[in-house]
Amino acid sequence: MKSVKLKVALIANLIAVVCLVILGVITFMFVKQAIFHEVVKAETNYVKTAKNSIESFKARNSLNLESLAESVLKHPVEQLDSQDALMRYVGKDLKNFRDAGRFLAVYIAQPNGELVVSDSDSDAKKVDFRTYGKADNYDARTRKYYIEAVKTNKLYATPSYIDVTTNLPCFTYSTPLYKDGKFIGVLAVDVLVTDLQAEFENLPGRTFVFDEENKVFASTDKTLLQQGLYDISAIANLAKIKENFEPFEYTRPEDGSERFAVCTKVFEVYTACVGEPIEQIEAPVYKIAFIQAIVVIIVVVFSVILLYFIVSKYLSPLAAIQTGLTSFFDFI
């Protein structure tokens, strides 16, 4: 009789286990999709936050440069059309503007390629500004910030580059200066990305931003700022053909690991991305699956025990019937 009870309990539990497994698989598939969608949504929001930080950074610097340009152009043309005039009437303003905005350097590149500049070297000489040019084997007219500002006749921002003094990424923002139809020169500021990097260090996720030359200039992961340490060409090339905020997967060349990414263009010259290992993205999904498996096992164990006692109770009359039948046939 105990054998019958056990077999009935096992058969009932086997049916229950099959049902639970089917239900668990179906639930897991729906939960996996839901969780993955939420993870992608969160990663996309990280990129949007990074994009906003970059836009604010450029907007602030562009506005500051335009404000200085307006201030410079308030002077009559005779106070701007020569190096001596610039040094006399504008030089000190460059120093004041640089200190107020914490810029690396502020300068005017003249049509002859010479600079009137306020920078760390002028600070070292304990002067507000200095000249820099042919005597130093430098010609502003050969530099991209000058060429592009003159060619486009509007504000221009260079790709990021490493400042030799601070060894940190920086940009040059430049704009042409015209007074009464006369070209005065190109006004420019060199801007360190320290403020932008400080913002990124408080952002969630592994977000970073790079320029047209695939140089990372701000990142929540500081190792990405070390030039040559990581090759971002794989993610950069895919980002060019993907829509903004379109999730995709790529293989990192350094270790062959599969990774998940979401990217977006910023001003059509920068790209903001978030890149995470696939395992990290899928971790919440498999955590749910593990919890479900544990729950199924616990339910099965308890159901076996419970069904055994239930079957024992409801099959107990069979023992009396069996005894009666045995006695009856013995009597016959």
Go through each PLM region and give its residues:
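Juxtamembrane interface helices immediately C-terminal to a transmembrane segment
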Residues: A9, T27-F57, N61, E78-S82, ...
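Extracytoplasmic/periplasmic sensory segments of membrane signal-transduction proteins
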Residues: K41-T49, F57-K154
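Extracellular/periplasmic juxtamembrane segments that couple receptor/chemosensory ectodomains to their
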Residues: E213, K222-T223, L229-I291
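Extracytoplasmic/periplasmic ligand-binding sensor regions of membrane-associated signaling proteins
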Residues: D99, S118-V191, L196-E199, R252
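Extreme N-terminal signal-anchor transmembrane helix of membrane signaling/transducer proteins, especially
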Residues: K2-H37, K41, A293-I298
